[in-house]
From Swiss-Prot:
Matches recorded under NCBIfam families: S15_bact (TIGR00952)
Protein's organism: Neorickettsia sennetsu (strain ATCC VR-367 / Miyayama)
GO biological process: translation
Name the record gives this protein: Small ribosomal subunit protein uS15
Lineage: Bacteria, Pseudomonadati, Pseudomonadota, Alphaproteobacteria, Rickettsiales
GO cellular component, one term: cytosolic small ribosomal subunit
Family to which the UniProt record says this protein belongs: Belongs to the universal ribosomal protein uS15 family.
Subunit structure as annotated in this protein's UniProt entry: Part of the 30S ribosomal subunit. Forms a bridge to the 50S subunit in the 70S ribosome, contacting the 23S rRNA.
General function of this protein: One of the primary rRNA binding proteins, it binds directly to 16S rRNA where it helps nucleate assembly of the platform of the 30S subunit by binding and bridging several RNA helices of the 16S rRNA.
A matching Pfam family: Ribosomal_S15
Keywords: Ribonucleoprotein, Ribosomal protein, RNA-binding, rRNA-binding
Single GO MF descriptor: rRNA binding
Length: 86
């Protein structure tokens, strides 16, 4: 799990020591969303995980809105790379 996170950070960072930019955060949220979605397909009545998933989706949406305002082309590229639909 830590290795996957490090790979995501390495792939989406903008500088060598960048771990918290909006691009990296969106990528990490997307990874967590995919993992929780897979979990919820097997455990349909896990309502606390479902609530956590909705919170993460909201955080990712707010970051994407920020990126759309400040770096429109970067946001579009990120959404294509992560296969996120608007």
């Amino acid at each position: 799990m830590v290795d996957e996170k490090a790979e995501v950070i390495k792939k989406f960072r903008t500088a060598d020591n960048d771990t918290g930019s909006a691009f990296v955060q969106v990528a990490l949220f997307t990874r967590r969303i995919n993992n929780l979605t897979r979990h919820l397909q097997g455990f349909k009545k896990d309502y606390s995980s479902r609530l956590g998933l909705l919170k993460i989706i909201s955080k990712r949406r707010r970051l994407l809105n920020y990126l759309a305002k400040n770096d429109c082309q970067g946001c579009k590229n990120l959404m294509e790379m992560l296969d996120i639909r608007k």
